């Protein structure tokens, strides 16, 4: 059975892991890193760059660089680059495709299946978009699991005692808090809450806003209008945030940040940890609301939590750790790597699916209530939030008017009392209802949530047996035809990438052969046969001319044409050197053998 890999598709960084020898291990990417920046760049020549190489060129190419695309999953947001439009699913698929390729290189075998993690508070549309991204990248997404749940798996797989844990997951762009009960291999989520628009990026933005304001005060120049300067500020802000986790003061020094009529301007500011915490105090407080909500939903007091797991790079900030410490009255657990534990948990779930990991049961929940719009614009819940999934629930409704021939089922997700305040997941019609006074027809509406948190809704007229159903893909979901088109484009790009890499290798080999040939000629020209020298020089010239053009087949041909003369030339040189090293007749060769026996005996004394 082929391997199923675990992927943490993050807002700022992504990570992948796999089960090896009964243990989940993080797989390094092609550059040797254990995490991959979730950044996609498009070079001026049209080449797609993903990961660290895309992040490195972002300063000089901000218009063609895409970051934090995860924040737009499940929306109709489009990225426009050089006249082309890309959906968040397509950009995410490019990141997943790189991870798939790197995993294949690490494992030495094809990777076609994956478990991908999402924030616990992701809506149905966002989950479906993640699944679509996997499909576009050529991966069969075997399971979508929640990030806090994955982190709990990574922490609790080898724990035997029963315990209640809280996962505090503050990533690059999203925040989740989940409460789980662990015991006898069962991981049961009791409650989850969160904020899909809160993460490390927001802390970076506060530093950026502060730098822009300070620089404007000093120089009168507004850097927010300069895209290249803003990209430099973004990198500097992230670096400052990271540094302030270990030092109390950091220097932000960006020479030649901009210029005016007087000449170039340099940016040099000091940011203290105290000032940073002042700038971000409200963001810290925003994490406490969902934390209180999850505790309330689980019916627990802070003292009943045995362990608090910190997940996501942003939890390294001292102010975050202090807020958690203050709320729960105890130190958070720091025994897991906040950047890698989610991918490790995804790999463990993959191991459960393949049978490599036994005696583990994962019981997750739906983060938001699901229901339909009823008379008066009211939101009627059919499945309450924090219900264990998979699950199915039914409720019977009736018509609102006499002789109503059809009903529109407006499917919603959220917690507000009125339909307008919640997110629309989809609409569909049940038609062919026989004429009858209002209140007589019986319409059974069934909600079915699978293990991935994907919703199916059906409506059935109990009188006629007629039914209609819909798999919710969200108003921004992609059709099968769109996904197929994107899959083909992704495959085509992968093929183009393979060809481009092959061309680079052919050119590199040809360059190396030219260098080797010219070096050999330079060292041995004087001792060589003039005809061989001439033949080799001509072959070198032909290959150099081929390298100036773009005809790869010609380069391959001329490389082969140079290999023969070079081998013949070096073989002749080797043979000549071997002959020169053989011993010739020495100076005593003509002497009589008897001369060697004419030894003179003599005494000597030491003086």
UniProtKB/Swiss-Prot annotation:
SUPFAM superfamilies: Actin-like ATPase domain, Heat shock protein 70kD (HSP70), C-terminal subdomain, Heat shock protein 70kD (HSP70), peptide-binding domain. Residues 589-607 have a biased composition (Basic and acidic residues). GO terms for molecular function: ATP binding; ATP-dependent protein folding chaperone; unfolded protein binding. Keywords: ATP-binding, Chaperone, Nucleotide-binding, Phosphoprotein, Stress response. The modification Phosphothreonine is found at residue 174. Residues 571-607 are annotated as: Disordered. Pfam families: HSP70 (PF00012). The keyword Phosphoprotein applies. It comes from the Bacteria. Induction: By stress conditions e.g. heat shock. InterPro entries: ATPase_NBD, Chaperone_DnaK, Heat_shock_70_CS, HSP70_C_sf, HSP70_peptide-bd_sf, Hsp_70_fam. CDD domains: ASKHA_NBD_HSP70_DnaK-like. Belongs to the heat shock protein 70 family. PANTHER family: HEAT SHOCK PROTEIN 70KDA (PTHR19375). Acts as a chaperone. This is Chaperone protein DnaK. It comes from Desulforudis audaxviator (strain MP104C).
């Amino acid at each position: 059975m082929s391997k199923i890999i675990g992927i943490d598709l993050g807002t700022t960084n992504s990570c992948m892991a796999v089960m090896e020898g009964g243990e989940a291990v993080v797989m390094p990417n092609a550059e040797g890193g254990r995490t991959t920046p979730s950044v996609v760049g498009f070079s001026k020549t049209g080449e797609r760059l993903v990961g660290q190489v895309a992040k490195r060129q972002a300063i000089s190419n901000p218009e063609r660089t895409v970051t934090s695309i995860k924040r737009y999953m499940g929306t109709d947001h489009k990225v426009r680059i050089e006249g082309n439009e890309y959906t968040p699913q397509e950009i995410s698929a490019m990141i997943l495709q790189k991870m798939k390729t790197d995993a294949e290189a690490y494992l030495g075998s094809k990777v076609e299946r994956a478990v991908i993690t999402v924030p616990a508070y992701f809506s149905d549309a966002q989950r479906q978009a993640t699944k679509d991204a996997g499909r576009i990248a050529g991966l069969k997404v075997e399971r979508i699991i929640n990030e806090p749940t994955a982190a709990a798996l990574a922490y609790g797989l080898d724990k035997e005692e029963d315990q209640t844990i809280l996962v505090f997951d503050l990533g690059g762009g999203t925040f989740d808090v989940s409460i789980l009960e662990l015991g006898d291999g069962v991981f049961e989520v009791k409650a989850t809450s969160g904020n899909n628009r809160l993460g490390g990026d927001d802390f970076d933005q506060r530093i950026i806003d502060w730098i822009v304001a300070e620089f404007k005060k000093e120089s009168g120049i507004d850097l927010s209008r300069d895209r290249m300067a803003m990209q430099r500020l973004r990198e500097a802000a992230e670096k400052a945030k990271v540094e302030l986790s270990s030092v109390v003061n950091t220097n932000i020094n960006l020479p030649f940040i901009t210029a005016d009529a007087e000449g170039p301007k340099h940016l040099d500011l000091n940011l203290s940890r105290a000032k940073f915490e002042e700038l971000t105090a409200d963001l810290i407080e925003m994490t406490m609301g969902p934390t209180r909500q999850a505790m309330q939903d689980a019916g627990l007091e802070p003292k009943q939590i045995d362990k608090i797991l910190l997940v996501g790079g942003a939890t390294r900030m001292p102010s975050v750790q202090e807020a958690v410490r203050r709320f729960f009255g105890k130190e958070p657990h720091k025994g897991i790597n906040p950047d890698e534990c989610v991918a490790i948990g995804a790999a463990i779930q993959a191991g459960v699916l393949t049978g490599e990991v036994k005696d583990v049961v994962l019981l997750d929940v739906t983060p938001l209530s699901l229901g339909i719009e009823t008379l008066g614009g009211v939101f009627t819940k059919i499945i309450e939030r924090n219900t264990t999934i998979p699950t199915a629930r039914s409720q019977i409704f009736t018509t609102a008017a006499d002789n109503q021939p059809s009903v529109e089922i407006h499917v919603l997700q959220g917690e507000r009392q009125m339909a307008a305040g919640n997110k629309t997941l989809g609409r569909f019609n049940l038609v062919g209802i026989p004429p009858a006074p209002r209140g007589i027809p019986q319409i059974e509406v069934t909600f079915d949530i699978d293990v991935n948190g994907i919703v199916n809704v059906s409506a059935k007229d109990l009188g006629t047996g007629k039914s209609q159903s819909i798999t919710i893909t969200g108003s921004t979901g992609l059709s099968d035809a769109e996904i197929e088109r994107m899959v083909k484009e992704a495959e085509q790009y992968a093929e183009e990438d393979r060809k481009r890499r092959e061309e680079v290798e052919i050119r590199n080999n040809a360059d190396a052969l030219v260098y080797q040939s010219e070096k050999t000629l330079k060292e041995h020209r004087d001792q060589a046969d003039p005809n061989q020298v001439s033949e080799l020089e001509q072959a070198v010239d032909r290959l150099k001319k081929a390298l100036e053009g773009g005809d790869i087949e010609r380069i391959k041909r001329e490389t082969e044409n140079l290999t023969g003369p070079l081998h013949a030339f070096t073989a002749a040189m080797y043979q000549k050197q071997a002959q020169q090293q053989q011993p010739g007749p020495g100076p005593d060769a003509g002497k009589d053998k008897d001369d060697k026996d004419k030894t003179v005996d003599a005494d000597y004394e030491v003086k």
